[in-house]
Curated annotation (Swiss-Prot):
Residues 375-398, 457-499 are annotated as: Disordered. It comes from Aspergillus clavatus (strain ATCC 1007 / CBS 513.65 / DSM 816 / NCTC 3887 / NRRL 1 / QM 1276 / 107). This is Probable HECT-type ubiquitin ligase-interacting protein creD. Keywords: Ubl conjugation pathway. One of its GO terms (cellular component) is plasma membrane.
Length: 602
Protein backbone atom coordinates (compact mmCIF):
# COMPACT_ATOMS: atom_id res chain seq x y z
CA UNK A 1 0.00 0.00 0.00
CA UNK A 2 1.75 3.14 -1.22
CA UNK A 3 1.07 6.56 0.26
CA UNK A 4 1.19 9.43 -2.23
CA UNK A 5 0.25 12.08 0.32
CA UNK A 6 -0.82 12.39 3.96
CA UNK A 7 -3.67 14.47 5.23
CA UNK A 8 -3.46 16.44 8.44
CA UNK A 9 -1.34 19.23 9.81
CA UNK A 10 2.35 19.46 10.45
CA UNK A 11 5.01 17.98 8.21
CA UNK A 12 3.01 14.93 7.16
CA UNK A 13 2.63 16.28 3.65
CA UNK A 14 6.40 16.20 3.16
CA UNK A 15 6.44 12.41 2.43
CA UNK A 16 5.22 12.15 -1.14
CA UNK A 17 5.85 8.43 -1.56
CA UNK A 18 6.36 5.68 1.00
CA UNK A 19 6.06 2.03 -0.01
CA UNK A 20 7.38 -1.52 0.51
CA UNK A 21 8.50 -3.13 -2.73
CA UNK A 22 9.33 -6.86 -2.81
CA UNK A 23 11.52 -8.53 -5.41
CA UNK A 24 9.04 -11.43 -5.54
CA UNK A 25 5.32 -11.16 -4.99
CA UNK A 26 5.26 -14.28 -2.81
CA UNK A 27 7.54 -16.90 -1.31
CA UNK A 28 7.29 -20.49 -2.56
CA UNK A 29 8.27 -23.56 -0.52
CA UNK A 30 8.34 -26.82 -2.48
CA UNK A 31 7.56 -29.84 -0.34
CA UNK A 32 6.55 -30.39 3.26
CA UNK A 33 7.89 -28.59 6.31
CA UNK A 34 10.50 -31.30 6.88
CA UNK A 35 11.89 -31.36 3.33
CA UNK A 36 11.46 -27.90 1.80
CA UNK A 37 14.56 -25.79 1.17
CA UNK A 38 15.00 -22.29 2.53
CA UNK A 39 14.01 -19.23 0.49
CA UNK A 40 15.32 -15.69 0.36
CA UNK A 41 13.02 -12.74 0.90
CA UNK A 42 14.36 -9.43 -0.37
CA UNK A 43 13.06 -6.02 -1.31
CA UNK A 44 13.36 -2.29 -0.78
CA UNK A 45 11.70 0.34 1.36
CA UNK A 46 11.15 3.41 -0.83
CA UNK A 47 10.77 6.94 0.52
CA UNK A 48 10.36 10.18 -1.45
CA UNK A 49 10.58 13.52 0.39
CA UNK A 50 9.92 16.91 -1.16
CA UNK A 51 11.11 18.75 1.95
CA UNK A 52 13.32 17.86 4.91
CA UNK A 53 11.66 15.63 7.49
CA UNK A 54 12.54 15.25 11.16
CA UNK A 55 12.26 11.59 12.21
CA UNK A 56 13.17 9.58 15.26
CA UNK A 57 13.58 6.32 13.34
CA UNK A 58 12.82 4.48 10.10
CA UNK A 59 11.95 0.82 10.68
CA UNK A 60 10.52 -2.16 8.89
CA UNK A 61 8.91 -5.05 10.72
CA UNK A 62 7.78 -8.48 9.44
CA UNK A 63 5.38 -10.38 11.70
CA UNK A 64 3.85 -13.85 11.40
CA UNK A 65 0.58 -14.30 13.30
CA UNK A 66 -1.62 -17.37 13.73
CA UNK A 67 -5.18 -17.27 15.00
CA UNK A 68 -7.59 -20.13 15.68
CA UNK A 69 -11.20 -19.29 16.52
CA UNK A 70 -14.65 -20.89 16.37
CA UNK A 71 -18.16 -20.12 17.58
CA UNK A 72 -20.31 -22.64 19.43
CA UNK A 73 -24.07 -22.14 19.80
CA UNK A 74 -25.23 -21.42 23.34
CA UNK A 75 -28.63 -21.79 25.00
CA UNK A 76 -28.41 -18.41 26.69
CA UNK A 77 -29.80 -15.20 25.27
CA UNK A 78 -26.30 -13.89 24.60
CA UNK A 79 -26.00 -16.09 21.51
CA UNK A 80 -22.91 -18.17 20.71
CA UNK A 81 -19.82 -18.93 22.73
CA UNK A 82 -16.46 -17.99 21.21
CA UNK A 83 -13.16 -19.85 21.63
CA UNK A 84 -10.01 -18.37 20.18
CA UNK A 85 -6.25 -18.10 20.49
CA UNK A 86 -3.80 -15.77 18.75
CA UNK A 87 -0.02 -16.02 18.73
CA UNK A 88 2.93 -14.25 17.11
CA UNK A 89 5.27 -17.03 15.93
CA UNK A 90 7.69 -14.99 13.79
CA UNK A 91 9.09 -11.46 13.97
CA UNK A 92 11.90 -9.70 12.16
CA UNK A 93 12.84 -5.99 12.39
CA UNK A 94 15.12 -3.85 10.19
CA UNK A 95 16.20 -0.44 11.54
CA UNK A 96 17.40 1.89 8.78
CA UNK A 97 17.53 5.15 10.79
CA UNK A 98 17.67 5.59 14.57
CA UNK A 99 18.47 8.97 16.14
CA UNK A 100 18.49 7.61 19.66
CA UNK A 101 16.31 8.15 22.70
CA UNK A 102 14.42 11.49 22.71
CA UNK A 103 16.35 12.64 19.64
CA UNK A 104 15.44 13.32 16.03
CA UNK A 105 17.26 13.16 12.72
CA UNK A 106 16.53 15.41 9.79
CA UNK A 107 16.10 13.56 6.50
CA UNK A 108 16.92 15.84 3.59
CA UNK A 109 14.57 16.13 0.64
CA UNK A 110 15.10 13.46 -2.01
CA UNK A 111 14.59 9.79 -2.77
CA UNK A 112 15.62 7.04 -0.37
CA UNK A 113 15.97 3.30 -0.89
CA UNK A 114 16.49 1.01 2.08
CA UNK A 115 17.22 -2.58 0.90
CA UNK A 116 16.44 -5.53 3.13
CA UNK A 117 16.64 -9.31 2.90
CA UNK A 118 16.18 -12.34 5.12
CA UNK A 119 16.44 -16.12 4.78
CA UNK A 120 13.15 -17.88 5.56
CA UNK A 121 13.43 -21.47 6.74
CA UNK A 122 11.54 -24.09 4.75
CA UNK A 123 9.80 -25.25 7.93
CA UNK A 124 7.91 -21.97 8.36
CA UNK A 125 4.10 -22.22 8.22
CA UNK A 126 2.40 -21.37 4.97
CA UNK A 127 -0.21 -18.64 4.67
CA UNK A 128 -3.76 -19.79 5.42
CA UNK A 129 -6.36 -17.18 4.52
CA UNK A 130 -10.03 -17.41 3.66
CA UNK A 131 -11.78 -18.20 6.93
CA UNK A 132 -13.34 -15.38 8.91
CA UNK A 133 -11.56 -15.71 12.27
CA UNK A 134 -8.95 -18.39 11.60
CA UNK A 135 -5.79 -17.62 9.66
CA UNK A 136 -2.00 -17.70 9.36
CA UNK A 137 -0.71 -14.43 7.91
CA UNK A 138 2.51 -12.49 7.40
CA UNK A 139 2.47 -8.70 7.31
CA UNK A 140 5.04 -5.98 6.75
CA UNK A 141 4.82 -2.73 8.67
CA UNK A 142 7.06 0.21 7.72
CA UNK A 143 7.15 3.13 10.13
CA UNK A 144 8.68 6.60 10.23
CA UNK A 145 8.61 7.71 13.86
CA UNK A 146 8.21 11.41 14.58
CA UNK A 147 8.42 13.35 17.84
CA UNK A 148 5.64 15.91 17.68
CA UNK A 149 3.45 14.44 14.95
CA UNK A 150 1.70 11.24 14.02
CA UNK A 151 3.92 8.41 12.81
CA UNK A 152 3.88 7.60 9.10
CA UNK A 153 2.93 3.93 8.68
CA UNK A 154 2.48 1.71 5.63
CA UNK A 155 1.54 -1.99 5.63
CA UNK A 156 1.88 -4.78 3.10
CA UNK A 157 0.86 -8.45 3.31
CA UNK A 158 3.21 -11.29 2.42
CA UNK A 159 1.96 -14.61 1.12
CA UNK A 160 3.94 -17.83 1.64
CA UNK A 161 2.87 -20.69 -0.63
CA UNK A 162 3.68 -24.32 0.03
CA UNK A 163 3.29 -26.29 -3.17
CA UNK A 164 4.08 -29.81 -4.30
CA UNK A 165 7.32 -30.86 -5.91
CA UNK A 166 7.26 -32.08 -9.50
CA UNK A 167 8.19 -35.57 -8.25
CA UNK A 168 5.40 -35.76 -5.66
CA UNK A 169 3.39 -38.97 -5.77
CA UNK A 170 0.13 -37.03 -5.58
CA UNK A 171 0.82 -35.66 -9.08
CA UNK A 172 1.41 -39.05 -10.71
CA UNK A 173 -0.78 -41.56 -8.89
CA UNK A 174 -4.41 -41.96 -9.91
CA UNK A 175 -7.02 -42.48 -7.21
CA UNK A 176 -9.79 -44.99 -7.79
CA UNK A 177 -12.43 -46.99 -5.96
CA UNK A 178 -13.81 -50.08 -7.67
CA UNK A 179 -15.79 -53.04 -6.49
CA UNK A 180 -18.66 -55.38 -7.31
CA UNK A 181 -22.05 -55.23 -5.65
CA UNK A 182 -23.20 -58.85 -6.09
CA UNK A 183 -26.24 -59.20 -8.33
CA UNK A 184 -26.39 -55.40 -8.60
CA UNK A 185 -23.61 -53.52 -10.31
CA UNK A 186 -19.88 -53.45 -11.02
CA UNK A 187 -18.45 -49.96 -10.64
CA UNK A 188 -15.19 -48.04 -10.96
CA UNK A 189 -14.82 -44.35 -10.03
CA UNK A 190 -11.42 -42.69 -10.44
CA UNK A 191 -9.54 -39.40 -10.77
CA UNK A 192 -6.39 -38.98 -12.93
CA UNK A 193 -4.36 -37.61 -10.00
CA UNK A 194 -4.86 -37.13 -6.31
CA UNK A 195 -3.56 -33.54 -6.33
CA UNK A 196 -5.61 -30.73 -7.90
CA UNK A 197 -4.53 -27.13 -8.48
CA UNK A 198 -6.60 -24.50 -6.72
CA UNK A 199 -8.87 -22.66 -9.15
CA UNK A 200 -8.86 -25.37 -11.85
CA UNK A 201 -11.26 -28.26 -12.49
CA UNK A 202 -11.39 -31.82 -11.17
CA UNK A 203 -12.15 -34.69 -13.55
CA UNK A 204 -13.97 -37.80 -12.35
CA UNK A 205 -14.20 -40.94 -14.53
CA UNK A 206 -17.13 -43.33 -14.06
CA UNK A 207 -17.56 -46.91 -15.27
CA UNK A 208 -20.83 -48.60 -14.29
CA UNK A 209 -21.81 -52.12 -15.45
CA UNK A 210 -25.25 -53.40 -14.31
CA UNK A 211 -25.25 -57.08 -13.29
CA UNK A 212 -29.02 -57.40 -12.81
CA UNK A 213 -31.33 -57.51 -15.80
CA UNK A 214 -33.67 -54.56 -15.78
CA UNK A 215 -31.51 -52.51 -13.35
CA UNK A 216 -31.40 -48.82 -14.26
CA UNK A 217 -29.03 -46.07 -13.15
CA UNK A 218 -30.73 -43.09 -11.55
CA UNK A 219 -29.27 -39.78 -10.39
CA UNK A 220 -25.50 -39.56 -9.86
CA UNK A 221 -24.34 -36.97 -7.32
CA UNK A 222 -20.69 -35.93 -6.90
CA UNK A 223 -19.64 -33.60 -4.09
CA UNK A 224 -16.33 -32.07 -3.00
CA UNK A 225 -16.29 -31.87 0.80
CA UNK A 226 -13.88 -29.72 2.82
CA UNK A 227 -13.22 -30.64 6.46
CA UNK A 228 -11.82 -28.27 9.10
CA UNK A 229 -10.02 -29.60 12.16
CA UNK A 230 -9.10 -26.68 14.44
CA UNK A 231 -7.01 -26.98 17.61
CA UNK A 232 -6.36 -24.20 20.13
CA UNK A 233 -3.37 -25.90 21.74
CA UNK A 234 -1.68 -28.10 19.10
CA UNK A 235 1.53 -28.37 21.13
CA UNK A 236 -0.25 -30.20 23.98
CA UNK A 237 -0.92 -33.98 24.10
CA UNK A 238 -3.97 -35.31 22.30
CA UNK A 239 -5.81 -36.05 25.53
CA UNK A 240 -6.00 -32.40 26.60
CA UNK A 241 -6.33 -30.68 23.23
CA UNK A 242 -9.24 -28.35 22.64
CA UNK A 243 -10.47 -29.12 19.12
CA UNK A 244 -13.37 -28.28 16.87
CA UNK A 245 -14.38 -30.05 13.65
CA UNK A 246 -16.65 -28.90 10.86
CA UNK A 247 -17.29 -29.59 7.17
CA UNK A 248 -18.67 -27.70 4.20
CA UNK A 249 -19.59 -28.59 0.63
CA UNK A 250 -17.41 -26.87 -1.95
CA UNK A 251 -18.85 -28.18 -5.24
CA UNK A 252 -21.87 -30.35 -6.01
CA UNK A 253 -22.68 -31.97 -9.36
CA UNK A 254 -25.87 -33.88 -10.27
CA UNK A 255 -26.12 -35.97 -13.41
CA UNK A 256 -28.59 -38.42 -14.94
CA UNK A 257 -27.77 -40.95 -17.62
CA UNK A 258 -29.47 -41.28 -20.97
CA UNK A 259 -30.33 -44.98 -21.10
CA UNK A 260 -30.51 -45.14 -24.89
CA UNK A 261 -27.48 -43.07 -25.83
CA UNK A 262 -24.99 -43.83 -23.05
CA UNK A 263 -25.02 -47.64 -23.08
CA UNK A 264 -21.87 -49.04 -24.70
CA UNK A 265 -19.65 -52.11 -24.77
CA UNK A 266 -16.96 -51.92 -22.07
CA UNK A 267 -13.81 -54.06 -22.21
CA UNK A 268 -15.33 -56.09 -25.09
CA UNK A 269 -17.24 -58.16 -22.56
CA UNK A 270 -20.17 -56.38 -20.93
CA UNK A 271 -22.53 -53.51 -21.60
CA UNK A 272 -22.35 -50.55 -19.29
CA UNK A 273 -21.92 -46.82 -18.90
CA UNK A 274 -18.59 -45.04 -19.18
CA UNK A 275 -18.37 -41.24 -18.89
CA UNK A 276 -16.52 -38.35 -17.19
CA UNK A 277 -17.67 -35.38 -15.14
CA UNK A 278 -15.80 -32.13 -14.42
CA UNK A 279 -16.09 -30.23 -11.14
CA UNK A 280 -15.01 -26.58 -11.42
CA UNK A 281 -13.28 -25.37 -8.25
CA UNK A 282 -13.96 -21.88 -6.85
CA UNK A 283 -11.59 -19.05 -7.75
CA UNK A 284 -11.45 -17.55 -4.26
CA UNK A 285 -9.98 -18.82 -0.99
CA UNK A 286 -13.05 -17.72 0.93
CA UNK A 287 -14.98 -20.61 -0.65
CA UNK A 288 -12.23 -23.21 -0.93
CA UNK A 289 -8.95 -23.53 0.98
CA UNK A 290 -5.82 -25.51 0.15
CA UNK A 291 -4.89 -28.67 2.01
CA UNK A 292 -2.73 -27.81 5.01
CA UNK A 293 -1.80 -28.88 8.51
CA UNK A 294 -0.04 -26.08 10.39
CA UNK A 295 -0.39 -24.05 13.59
CA UNK A 296 -3.47 -25.99 14.72
CA UNK A 297 -5.29 -25.60 11.38
CA UNK A 298 -5.90 -28.81 9.44
CA UNK A 299 -7.75 -28.68 6.11
CA UNK A 300 -8.58 -31.80 4.09
CA UNK A 301 -10.75 -32.59 1.05
CA UNK A 302 -12.56 -35.65 -0.26
CA UNK A 303 -14.99 -36.59 -3.02
CA UNK A 304 -18.30 -38.20 -2.10
CA UNK A 305 -20.43 -40.08 -4.62
CA UNK A 306 -24.02 -41.28 -4.51
CA UNK A 307 -25.42 -43.41 -7.34
CA UNK A 308 -29.11 -44.34 -7.34
CA UNK A 309 -29.96 -47.87 -8.55
CA UNK A 310 -33.54 -48.41 -9.77
CA UNK A 311 -34.29 -52.11 -9.23
CA UNK A 312 -36.77 -54.03 -11.41
CA UNK A 313 -39.08 -54.65 -8.43
CA UNK A 314 -39.48 -50.89 -7.87
CA UNK A 315 -37.36 -50.18 -4.80
CA UNK A 316 -34.33 -47.84 -4.95
CA UNK A 317 -30.83 -48.75 -3.81
CA UNK A 318 -27.96 -46.29 -3.41
CA UNK A 319 -24.27 -46.83 -4.06
CA UNK A 320 -21.95 -44.65 -1.95
CA UNK A 321 -18.21 -44.15 -2.31
CA UNK A 322 -15.51 -41.65 -1.33
CA UNK A 323 -12.12 -40.65 -2.75
CA UNK A 324 -9.47 -38.48 -1.08
CA UNK A 325 -8.13 -35.51 -3.05
CA UNK A 326 -5.52 -32.85 -2.27
CA UNK A 327 -5.84 -29.20 -3.34
CA UNK A 328 -2.68 -27.09 -3.53
CA UNK A 329 -1.86 -23.57 -4.71
CA UNK A 330 0.22 -23.25 -7.86
CA UNK A 331 2.78 -20.41 -8.10
CA UNK A 332 1.63 -19.92 -11.70
CA UNK A 333 -1.81 -18.72 -10.57
CA UNK A 334 -1.38 -15.43 -8.73
CA UNK A 335 -3.71 -14.55 -5.84
CA UNK A 336 -4.42 -10.93 -4.94
CA UNK A 337 -4.75 -9.34 -1.50
CA UNK A 338 -8.46 -10.19 -1.41
CA UNK A 339 -7.69 -13.92 -1.78
CA UNK A 340 -9.04 -14.10 -5.34
CA UNK A 341 -7.30 -15.40 -8.45
CA UNK A 342 -5.93 -12.52 -10.50
CA UNK A 343 -6.59 -14.24 -13.84
CA UNK A 344 -9.68 -16.46 -13.79
CA UNK A 345 -9.84 -17.40 -17.47
CA UNK A 346 -9.98 -21.10 -18.45
CA UNK A 347 -6.88 -20.66 -20.61
CA UNK A 348 -4.80 -19.62 -17.59
CA UNK A 349 -6.02 -22.61 -15.58
CA UNK A 350 -5.20 -24.95 -18.47
CA UNK A 351 -1.74 -23.44 -18.73
CA UNK A 352 -1.09 -23.99 -15.01
CA UNK A 353 -2.06 -27.66 -15.32
CA UNK A 354 0.24 -28.13 -18.32
CA UNK A 355 3.13 -26.43 -16.51
CA UNK A 356 2.84 -28.85 -13.60
CA UNK A 357 2.67 -31.84 -15.96
CA UNK A 358 5.76 -30.71 -17.91
CA UNK A 359 7.64 -29.02 -15.09
CA UNK A 360 11.38 -28.74 -15.70
CA UNK A 361 13.98 -29.05 -12.92
CA UNK A 362 14.23 -25.90 -10.76
CA UNK A 363 16.66 -23.18 -11.69
CA UNK A 364 20.08 -22.92 -10.08
CA UNK A 365 19.08 -19.77 -8.20
CA UNK A 366 16.33 -21.65 -6.41
CA UNK A 367 18.89 -24.02 -4.85
CA UNK A 368 21.48 -21.58 -3.56
CA UNK A 369 20.43 -22.34 0.02
CA UNK A 370 20.40 -26.14 -0.29
CA UNK A 371 22.61 -28.27 1.90
CA UNK A 372 26.12 -28.64 0.52
CA UNK A 373 27.59 -32.03 -0.33
CA UNK A 374 30.41 -31.44 2.16
CA UNK A 375 27.79 -31.28 4.92
CA UNK A 376 26.26 -34.65 4.04
CA UNK A 377 27.32 -37.69 6.06
CA UNK A 378 28.88 -40.07 3.48
CA UNK A 379 28.37 -43.16 5.62
CA UNK A 380 26.22 -45.66 3.82
CA UNK A 381 26.81 -44.17 0.38
CA UNK A 382 30.15 -45.79 -0.48
CA UNK A 383 30.65 -49.28 -1.80
CA UNK A 384 31.71 -51.89 -1.01
CA UNK A 385 30.26 -51.72 2.47
CA UNK A 386 32.05 -53.05 5.52
CA UNK A 387 30.02 -56.24 5.38
CA UNK A 388 30.40 -56.89 1.66
CA UNK A 389 32.80 -59.56 0.47
CA UNK A 390 34.79 -58.44 -2.59
CA UNK A 391 35.71 -61.97 -3.62
CA UNK A 392 32.47 -63.05 -5.28
CA UNK A 393 33.39 -65.70 -7.88
CA UNK A 394 32.14 -66.06 -11.42
CA UNK A 395 29.27 -68.51 -11.40
CA UNK A 396 30.22 -70.13 -14.68
CA UNK A 397 33.86 -70.68 -13.71
CA UNK A 398 33.76 -71.40 -10.00
CA UNK A 399 31.91 -73.76 -7.71
CA UNK A 400 32.19 -71.39 -4.76
CA UNK A 401 28.49 -70.56 -5.03
CA UNK A 402 27.51 -74.15 -4.19
CA UNK A 403 27.10 -75.60 -0.76
CA UNK A 404 30.37 -77.53 -0.54
CA UNK A 405 32.42 -74.33 -0.35
CA UNK A 406 30.50 -72.46 2.34
CA UNK A 407 33.02 -73.49 4.96
CA UNK A 408 35.97 -72.47 2.83
CA UNK A 409 34.52 -69.01 2.24
CA UNK A 410 35.20 -68.15 5.88
CA UNK A 411 38.91 -67.95 5.09
CA UNK A 412 38.16 -65.09 2.69
CA UNK A 413 38.31 -62.52 5.45
CA UNK A 414 41.67 -63.53 6.87
CA UNK A 415 43.99 -62.23 4.15
CA UNK A 416 45.03 -58.85 2.86
CA UNK A 417 45.87 -57.56 -0.58
CA UNK A 418 49.37 -56.25 -1.04
CA UNK A 419 51.22 -54.58 -3.87
CA UNK A 420 53.80 -57.34 -3.90
CA UNK A 421 51.12 -59.94 -4.58
CA UNK A 422 49.82 -57.98 -7.55
CA UNK A 423 53.32 -57.47 -8.89
CA UNK A 424 54.00 -61.20 -8.54
CA UNK A 425 50.90 -62.01 -10.59
CA UNK A 426 51.97 -59.63 -13.32
CA UNK A 427 55.51 -60.99 -13.45
CA UNK A 428 54.27 -64.59 -13.59
CA UNK A 429 51.89 -63.69 -16.38
CA UNK A 430 54.69 -62.00 -18.32
CA UNK A 431 57.07 -64.94 -17.76
CA UNK A 432 54.51 -67.49 -18.93
CA UNK A 433 54.48 -65.90 -22.40
CA UNK A 434 58.15 -66.77 -23.01
CA UNK A 435 58.01 -70.36 -21.73
CA UNK A 436 56.13 -73.15 -23.47
CA UNK A 437 56.25 -76.21 -21.22
CA UNK A 438 55.45 -79.53 -22.75
CA UNK A 439 52.24 -81.32 -21.80
CA UNK A 440 54.26 -83.81 -19.81
CA UNK A 441 55.85 -81.09 -17.72
CA UNK A 442 52.47 -79.49 -17.09
CA UNK A 443 50.96 -82.80 -16.00
CA UNK A 444 53.90 -83.57 -13.70
CA UNK A 445 53.68 -80.11 -12.14
CA UNK A 446 49.92 -80.44 -11.63
CA UNK A 447 50.31 -83.91 -10.08
CA UNK A 448 52.93 -82.67 -7.64
CA UNK A 449 50.77 -79.74 -6.61
CA UNK A 450 47.75 -81.97 -6.13
CA UNK A 451 49.76 -84.36 -3.97
CA UNK A 452 51.10 -81.42 -1.94
CA UNK A 453 47.61 -80.07 -1.34
CA UNK A 454 46.10 -83.46 -0.63
CA UNK A 455 43.78 -83.50 -3.64
CA UNK A 456 42.93 -86.86 -5.12
CA UNK A 457 43.89 -87.37 -8.76
CA UNK A 458 41.28 -90.03 -9.39
CA UNK A 459 38.75 -89.65 -12.16
CA UNK A 460 35.89 -87.35 -11.26
CA UNK A 461 33.36 -89.92 -12.40
CA UNK A 462 35.29 -92.87 -11.08
CA UNK A 463 34.47 -94.89 -7.99
CA UNK A 464 36.68 -92.80 -5.78
CA UNK A 465 34.78 -89.60 -6.47
CA UNK A 466 32.05 -90.48 -4.07
CA UNK A 467 28.37 -90.88 -4.51
CA UNK A 468 27.56 -87.21 -4.41
CA UNK A 469 29.88 -84.58 -5.85
CA UNK A 470 27.98 -81.78 -4.10
CA UNK A 471 28.62 -83.03 -0.61
CA UNK A 472 29.42 -80.32 1.95
CA UNK A 473 32.51 -82.27 2.91
CA UNK A 474 34.43 -81.39 -0.26
CA UNK A 475 35.67 -77.83 0.17
CA UNK A 476 38.94 -78.69 -1.61
CA UNK A 477 37.30 -78.37 -5.03
CA UNK A 478 37.67 -74.58 -5.00
CA UNK A 479 40.03 -73.22 -7.64
CA UNK A 480 42.99 -70.95 -7.14
CA UNK A 481 42.72 -67.81 -9.30
CA UNK A 482 46.47 -67.17 -9.54
CA UNK A 483 49.84 -68.73 -8.79
CA UNK A 484 51.22 -66.58 -6.04
CA UNK A 485 48.88 -68.24 -3.57
CA UNK A 486 51.03 -71.37 -3.84
CA UNK A 487 53.90 -69.46 -2.36
CA UNK A 488 52.44 -66.61 -0.30
CA UNK A 489 49.41 -68.34 1.19
CA UNK A 490 50.30 -71.97 1.59
CA UNK A 491 48.22 -72.22 4.72
CA UNK A 492 45.04 -71.04 2.97
CA UNK A 493 42.83 -73.43 1.00
CA UNK A 494 42.62 -73.07 -2.74
CA UNK A 495 40.79 -69.95 -3.92
CA UNK A 496 40.97 -68.19 -0.56
CA UNK A 497 43.56 -65.50 -1.33
CA UNK A 498 41.04 -62.72 -1.92
CA UNK A 499 41.18 -60.03 0.78
CA UNK A 500 38.33 -58.70 2.86
CA UNK A 501 39.73 -55.21 3.47
CA UNK A 502 41.93 -54.39 0.44
CA UNK A 503 44.50 -51.66 0.73
CA UNK A 504 42.73 -49.21 -1.53
CA UNK A 505 45.52 -46.64 -1.39
CA UNK A 506 48.04 -49.11 -2.86
CA UNK A 507 45.56 -50.36 -5.45
CA UNK A 508 44.87 -46.80 -6.59
CA UNK A 509 48.62 -46.23 -6.91
CA UNK A 510 49.00 -49.25 -9.18
CA UNK A 511 46.01 -48.31 -11.32
CA UNK A 512 47.00 -44.67 -11.73
CA UNK A 513 47.11 -43.60 -15.39
CA UNK A 514 49.98 -41.28 -16.40
CA UNK A 515 49.28 -37.96 -18.06
CA UNK A 516 49.60 -37.48 -21.81
CA UNK A 517 52.88 -35.55 -21.55
CA UNK A 518 54.42 -38.23 -19.31
CA UNK A 519 53.39 -40.99 -21.71
CA UNK A 520 54.93 -39.11 -24.66
CA UNK A 521 58.29 -38.72 -22.89
CA UNK A 522 58.54 -42.39 -21.92
CA UNK A 523 60.10 -44.96 -24.27
CA UNK A 524 57.89 -47.53 -25.93
CA UNK A 525 58.81 -51.05 -24.88
CA UNK A 526 57.91 -53.88 -27.27
CA UNK A 527 55.45 -56.41 -26.00
CA UNK A 528 57.88 -59.26 -26.78
CA UNK A 529 61.57 -58.72 -27.44
CA UNK A 530 61.86 -61.91 -29.54
CA UNK A 531 59.32 -60.76 -32.12
CA UNK A 532 60.75 -58.91 -35.15
CA UNK A 533 59.75 -55.32 -35.77
CA UNK A 534 58.01 -54.05 -38.90
CA UNK A 535 61.20 -53.09 -40.77
CA UNK A 536 62.73 -56.55 -40.27
CA UNK A 537 59.65 -58.30 -41.62
CA UNK A 538 59.50 -56.07 -44.71
CA UNK A 539 63.22 -56.59 -45.44
CA UNK A 540 62.88 -60.38 -45.55
CA UNK A 541 62.25 -61.94 -48.97
CA UNK A 542 59.88 -64.69 -48.05
CA UNK A 543 58.19 -66.92 -50.58
CA UNK A 544 54.66 -67.88 -49.70
CA UNK A 545 53.99 -71.60 -50.36
CA UNK A 546 51.27 -72.40 -52.85
CA UNK A 547 48.03 -73.41 -51.22
CA UNK A 548 46.80 -76.92 -52.03
CA UNK A 549 43.35 -78.35 -51.60
CA UNK A 550 42.94 -81.09 -49.00
CA UNK A 551 43.42 -84.61 -50.27
CA UNK A 552 42.10 -87.90 -49.04
CA UNK A 553 43.25 -91.31 -50.21
CA UNK A 554 41.03 -94.37 -50.24
CA UNK A 555 42.76 -97.80 -50.43
CA UNK A 556 40.83 -100.95 -51.09
CA UNK A 557 41.93 -104.37 -49.87
CA UNK A 558 43.11 -107.05 -52.25
CA UNK A 559 39.96 -109.11 -51.97
CA UNK A 560 37.11 -108.66 -54.46
CA UNK A 561 34.36 -109.51 -52.08
CA UNK A 562 35.44 -107.25 -49.25
CA UNK A 563 36.73 -103.73 -49.24
CA UNK A 564 38.14 -101.41 -46.58
CA UNK A 565 38.47 -97.61 -46.84
CA UNK A 566 41.28 -95.95 -44.98
CA UNK A 567 40.73 -92.18 -44.78
CA UNK A 568 43.39 -89.70 -43.76
CA UNK A 569 41.85 -86.32 -42.88
CA UNK A 570 43.54 -82.98 -43.30
CA UNK A 571 43.45 -82.24 -39.58
CA UNK A 572 45.61 -85.31 -38.90
CA UNK A 573 48.09 -84.29 -41.55
CA UNK A 574 48.45 -80.88 -40.03
CA UNK A 575 48.71 -82.19 -36.48
CA UNK A 576 51.98 -83.96 -37.02
CA UNK A 577 50.75 -87.57 -37.29
CA UNK A 578 52.84 -87.92 -40.48
CA UNK A 579 56.36 -86.66 -40.46
CA UNK A 580 56.48 -85.56 -44.06
CA UNK A 581 54.02 -83.52 -46.11
CA UNK A 582 55.65 -84.07 -49.55
CA UNK A 583 57.60 -86.85 -51.25
CA UNK A 584 60.01 -87.07 -54.15
CA UNK A 585 58.95 -87.93 -57.67
CA UNK A 586 59.96 -91.59 -57.31
CA UNK A 587 57.65 -92.17 -54.37
CA UNK A 588 54.84 -90.41 -56.21
CA UNK A 589 55.18 -92.66 -59.28
CA UNK A 590 55.36 -95.76 -57.11
CA UNK A 591 52.12 -94.77 -55.29
CA UNK A 592 50.31 -94.22 -58.58
CA UNK A 593 51.46 -97.61 -59.87
CA UNK A 594 50.09 -99.40 -56.82
CA UNK A 595 46.75 -97.66 -57.23
CA UNK A 596 46.49 -98.73 -60.90
CA UNK A 597 47.32 -102.35 -59.99
CA UNK A 598 44.72 -102.37 -57.26
CA UNK A 599 42.05 -101.11 -59.62
CA UNK A 600 42.99 -103.73 -62.23
CA UNK A 601 42.52 -106.53 -59.73
CA UNK A 602 39.06 -105.28 -58.88
Amino acid sequence: MALSFFSGGGSASYAKYFDIRLDEGYIVFRGGEQEAASAQLSGKLLLCLSEPLAAKHVRLNLTGISRVCWHLPSGSASGSRKSWREKVFYEKTWTFRDAGKSKTEVLAAGNYEFPFHVILEGSMPESVEGLSDTYVTYRFKAEIGRKYAKDIVVRKPLRIIRTLESSALELSHAMSVENIWPNKIEYSISTPTKAVIFGTSLRVDFKLIPLLKGLKIGQIVSQLIESHDLTLNPEDPDSIRNTYKSTRTIVSDEYELDDEGSLEIIDEEAEGYQFSRYLDLPKTLTRCLQDTDTRGIKIRHKLKFRVQLLNPDGHISELRATLPVSIFISPNLAIDENNNLVDQTPQTARRAVDDIAQQAPPLYGEHQFDQLYSEVDPSGYRTPGPGSGPGTPFGALSRNISSENLASMNALTSTDLSVSALQTRLSNLHASRFSNPSPTEIDNHADSEQRRLGISTADYFGPSSGSNSHSPASPELSRRPSDEGYRDHDHIPSGMATPFHPQYAEVETLSRVPSYSTAMRSTVRPCDSELPDYQAVVAEDTAMPALQSPQQAYIRSAGRGTSMNTGIDVHQLRSGHFSSRTSNSHDEEDRRLRLVQARARV
